[in-house]
Amino acid sequence: MSEARQQSSSEGGGDLSDYEEKFEQCCTLLEQRIIQDDQIPRNVRRAAKQAIEALKEEGQSPGVRASTAISTLEEVVNDQNTPEYARTVLLQVIATLEQVKDEV
């Protein structure tokens, strides 16, 4: 039984790569669908850049990184100037980050 506990605790590092994979997916979505789209208002693109920076901040725990990015994106998701298709992408990213935050 103790061997199983040791294995599960040593697999904790594998969980970290799961977080990193989700963070990378979110960063890719934000980069390709928000930041590179000139039709999206500057404040929304700026928030997406800030969220990416928060997700890449390796000095913080995955939960803190996800929470910081979520709060940044939530500031602009309800902005009346945010196009509907951009809002959909932002909500998709927020949902993915909520999973990470809840797992921690």
Swiss-Prot record:
Lineage: Archaea, Methanobacteriati, Methanobacteriota, Methanomada group, Methanopyri
Entry's family note: Belongs to the UPF0147 family.
The name this protein goes by in its record: UPF0147 protein MK1586
InterPro entries (UniProt xref): Ta0600-like_sf (IPR023130), UPF0147 (IPR005354)
Highest taxon of the lineage: Archaea
NCBIfam families linked: PRK04330.1
One Pfam family it belongs to: UPF0147
